[in-house]
Amino acid sequence: MSSENSEYYSDKEEDSVVNNSSLGRSRKSSRLSKSSRLSKSSRPSSAGVVIDETQSEEEESQSSETAESEKSDESDNSQNSQESEDSEDDSVRPSARNTKRKPLGIPSDSEDEEDELEQRALSPSTRMSITGVRPQDLSDDDSEIEYSDEVQEGPTEAPTAEAVVPRYTTQFAGNIQNDLHSTIGAADSEVLDDSSGSDVLILSNKETPIEILSSTDDDATTNKENMSGPPFERPSKSLSPRSSAGASVVKTSKNLSQPTIQAVLKQKTSPAAPRRSRIKSEDQKVVSQVVYDEEMRKLAEKRVQVSDAEKLFEKVAHKLPDKGSQIMKRIDTLRRELAMDEQWISALRVQQSNVPAVRVVKPTLNPPRAPSIDTLDWDELSEAVNEIKPVYTGAQGMATFNNQKALTLESLKDLHVSLEDLPGPEVLAEDPVGLKVSLMNHQKHALAWMSWRERKLPRGGILADDMGLGKTLTMISSVLACKNGQEMSEGKDESSDSDSEDDKNKKRKSVTGWKSKGRKDTRRGGTLVVCPASLLRQWESEVESKVSRQKLTVCVHHGNNRETKGKYLRDYDIVVTTYQIVAREHKSLSAVFGVKWRRIILDEAHVVRNHKSQSSLAVCDLRGKYRWALTGTPIQNKELDVYALLKFLRCSPFDDLHTWKKWIDNKSAGGQNRLNLLMKSLMLRRTKAQLQSDGKLNSLPNKELRLIEISLDKEEMNVYQTVMTYSRTLFAQFLHQRAERETDFNYRSDANKPTYNQIKDPNGAYYKMHEKFARMAGSKKEVKSHDILVLLLRLRQICCHPGLIDAMLDGEESQTMGDHSSDSDTPEIDLLAQLNKLAITDTSTDGQQSVANAGDDGPPLLPDEARIAKASKNLLKRSNPVFNLHRPSSKINMVIQILKTSILKSSDDKAIVVSQWTSVLDILRDHLSKDGVATLSLNGTIPVKNRQDIVNEFNDRNNQKRVLLLSLTAGGVGLNLIGANHLLLLDLHWNPQLEAQAQDRIYRVGQKKNVIIYKFMCVDTVEQRIKGLQDKKLDLADGVLTGAKVSSKLTIDDLKGLFGM
């Protein structure tokens, strides 16, 4: 072995390479000169073959003279002495001529026999028949395939130490997969197809691989610019007698070494996908779509394994003797593998093949028709029901199970059959008589769908159109159509007082009619609308502005002077009330519960998504013939939200919680299919994007979202970082206490009793920890979960204005301040040391005294905490100008700047500023008033009866007050504020759905101007992490049923991310 190659090959590696050779061949190879070895440079073989440069080196050196002497004589007789079948025989067995070539000087013993067998097995003809590549030592008369004579016969220069060509490599060359074709196959194969998944291994980027072109590649470009090494040379073409389709001519490149049989067999059994350890260059990362999808599936499984392992570690690590060290090792291994897989898959590129692997059929464009709603066959649904097994197999248990199963199948069958006459999107109802405005097409279709739904059981459904698509006007049109007598004949012939629940539960009726606490039968009424308080006047305003006079009468049932008897409510066509009033009157069953309503409408029905709440229980007990739920988000937290709506609709038997959990919400594919059937038959949902893509909502203007990033100034950032440091410390203490609390609970449980050694040694580590936890639990310094949330609140308020934390503490915690009733009498304080108490108390100006006072009610502060407290002594005091509310913060300045330069500068544009805190809106109002900007305010302090007047005043084009300060909770739902086309979100909320509802106050049907949403975010703060949390929640949207967003609740992982831990 030469010194140049010594750094690449060791003796062990050399032995492993030639391990498959016989002993005699090894002895012959050892007598080869070093110069002969260096003269043989490795060359690639056909696609997928691993090249071994040590193969046949002795044959090339020993038979070179013999081959040269016999080449001329044999070439003259090759045409006359061989037939096509002889050539075929040579392709599958060793050549007789080659078997007789024996090098001189080799003794004829047992080793010679092994050498002869080795030569037969590795003869050029054998390798030619297997690989389809002509070896260099095969003379011209051995095959009838024409080869180019441009192959370099002489030796090449030995590679230097700096540029040594390794024996094995894992690199592809260029876009070789676009030009390679499989050469290993049946003898009677046709023109070979592209082998896009071949695992081609080329020895070096500096070498030219073999180019094998089919007969159809005449016009293909042979010089690939992005390929490594010299360009390909076009080989001459001829037809092989072994291929009836005309197999392409194979031209070998320069400096090729011959493949081995083992390498060929290895390639025949190797997978189509490239091995991850072999991919290094960009061109090697081209894979088929099937391989890419399979790798993505494996990556998803790996992520699930990592997540499961982490959850297992959190639950059982503290219970194990090794404290979960083995599980942690497994987690580390999985994380490393996951990181490698992600890095590898990110570099993959799906190959765009010109020849499709399967036949692609373009769908024919049919005339528009109603979409197929029934995607499941009834046999599949019924079989899925039969898969559920009873829990109790006794006589009573089986009877109950069979009864539930029969009711479930009957109800599903009715819903499945009802889909047969479901009106398609092209079915539109006429505008009812007395309506001043014309309905849009999607509203007309909703009116037709509602008329169809009221003829089925249950009578009613869920209108889940996107926010701002006119659900209120659609329902008013339905009420007007009912009064005009435009209902179907089934509705006229039926008893208007029949209740869907009464149809299913006859036992609830007595002979004399419906009885409740000894009073007479309830009275027949019109339509009851239950909505949030902020929408009371909007319903009244919609009826007055959209319906002709005297067509519909409206009563707002709200306030202390509302009617207390139902007989005074039955004469109105529409009675509007709130969820709070219904829940209050539910206790005495008065007023609204004394009327049997023709129609009950729940506006913003997601308010009652908790089926255990008082409002949900109250609305479910209301009596009515038709029951409707209006909501843009039927699911906000979980699938159980749908159960609350089905309970209100009285969709038997799924309005029973036990039946719901057993047959619907059972985490199975069958349960999901049954839920889909319920939603397809009971719910109608259209989004703005869907209607715009279908061309049915061309009147809606464009919507633009702008993210405004703000950097806090130096003073504000100092305050923020100080509070953040304390917050992280307190949160870490909270996590520590939480972990110890779980350990203590495990100690108390029977399944986790202390061991004998622990009992024997009462001073062990476990008991020390337990005593420490008991002392901590008994002290006043235990951190509660609400303390953590309050800290997050303080951090978010600092982003809006640092003065909010002082004002909030001074306002809300004034009762704990003792005699300090005014700012002038209150001494300087250390907010950091007292922040966890959420109160303002006396502290000394000396830092050490401050630390001592902080420890009066608990353990003293740690040295680090004392140092931080001392450093922040002057920073977190009222005398700091940053807490002055008259000083505009960075965010307030940016809001004022945008209002002046981008919005108010226009002649008629209006803006709405939304915030979660009215204190922020008050600060902004004061600064705007100094600049002469008049504003309107709508928040929780405004009486409900006056809120609609403020909305009407703001929507008036002639009104000069062009800025509305809106509270997110008071006015973020249901209001129609299309008078403005700019919305400024001052602060970010955990639940992005609330922000989306606020945006739809201006982006709704009737808006004529382009809408611009401004979202303000302070960078390098908790707001930036909240933005990431919002994006994650939006990515987890449940689009199967409604497209609604996931829960707004914060988890421990969310809190860790917010605190940067």
Swiss-Prot record:
Domain of life of the native organism: Eukaryota
Family that this chain belongs to: Belongs to the SNF2/RAD54 helicase family.
Start and end residues of each Helicase ATP-binding domain: 452-652
Enzyme class, spelled out: hydrolase
Positions of ATP binding: 465-472
Protein name in the entry: Transcription termination factor 2
Motif (DEAH box): 603-606
Native species: Drosophila melanogaster (Fruit fly)
Chief location category: nucleus
Skewed-composition ranges (Polar residues): 237-253
Keywords (A to Z) from UniProt: ATP-binding, DNA-binding, Helicase, Hydrolase, Nucleotide-binding, Nucleus, Phosphoprotein, Transcription, Transcription regulation, Transcription termination
SUPFAM superfamilies: P-loop containing nucleoside triphosphate hydrolases
Biased composition (Low complexity): 32-46
Residues carrying Phosphoserine: 108, 110, 214-215
